[in-house]
């Protein structure tokens, strides 16, 4: 069983949600886990239970239901008290404003080609109507990271694909475009230590 070092951060994306299945852009809208998403969360929990041990651990979670459900399933599997989970607003998904709920980014590109272009080419200037800008999004994540690295206890962060990309990108000092191009998968746990990154592909996945 692996022993986590004190500077370790583990990034987990929530399981599949109803809107994931429907192909809708979620942003900060709530959408519960599907049965498949619950099974995904259980698979992640099993991996942590079987392969990692922690003398101490802190779990931080996005306030959205899909992340909280995932966090609770994971916590139960490793005997981590649910009341000790920290709900962290700065781990919330990107506030996409009026485009949240749209059926896919292709539809957004039809409605606003320039907005869609910025998202991929210069995401820090991406600013959907009624939402937050890419630079604001990066700033809140950077602020959170600056806080948690002061405490060397291992940490498990359960949030969203775009949040995980920016966390990884900030630590590697990547540009906004490089961050958005990072791979991100629900069957992968990202283990960060200092400025190194390890991708842990789950051996058993629903």
Where are these regions (language model features)?
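Extreme N-terminal starter segment of soluble prokaryotic enzymes
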Residues: 3-10
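Active-site-proximal alpha-helix that buttresses catalytic centers in soluble enzyme cores
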Residues: 7, 16-80
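Generic beta-sheet signal
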Residues: 9, 57, 151-162
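Short active-site segment of divalent metal-dependent hydrolases/proteases
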Residues: 17, 163-164
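Phosphate-handling substructures
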Residues: 32, 77-140, 181
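Conserved histidine-centered catalytic loops in small-molecule metabolism enzymes
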Residues: 55-79, 83-90, 114-117, 193-206
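Short beta-strand scaffold positions
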Residues: 61-62, 139, 157-159
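Domain-level recognition of soluble alpha/beta enzyme cores
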Residues: 174-200
């Amino acid at each position: 069983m692996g022993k986590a070092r004190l500077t370790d951060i583990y990034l987990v994306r929530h399981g599949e949600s109803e809107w994931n299945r429907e192909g809708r852009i979620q942003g900060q809208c709530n959408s519960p886990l599907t049965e498949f998403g619950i099974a995904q969360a259980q698979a992640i929990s099993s991996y942590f239970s079987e392969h990692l041990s922690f003398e101490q651990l802190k779990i931080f979670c996005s306030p959205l239901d899909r992340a909280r459900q995932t966090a609770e399933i994971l916590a139960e599997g490793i005997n981590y008290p649910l009341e000790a989970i920290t709900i962290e607003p700065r781990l919330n998904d990107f506030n996409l404003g009026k485009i949240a709920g749209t059926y896919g980014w292709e539809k957004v590109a039809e409605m606003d080609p320039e907005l869609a272009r910025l998202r991929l080419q210069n995401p820090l200037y991406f600013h959907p109507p009624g939402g937050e800008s890419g630079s604001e999004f990066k700033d809140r994540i950077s602020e959170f990271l600056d806080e948690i690295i002061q405490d060397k206890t291992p940490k498990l962060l359960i949030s969203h694909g775009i949040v995980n990309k920016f966390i990884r990108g900030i630590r590697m000092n990547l540009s906004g475009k490089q961050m958005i191009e990072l791979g991100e998968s629900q069957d992968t746990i990202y283990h960060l230590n200092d400025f190194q990154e390890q991708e842990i592909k789950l051996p058993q996945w629903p």
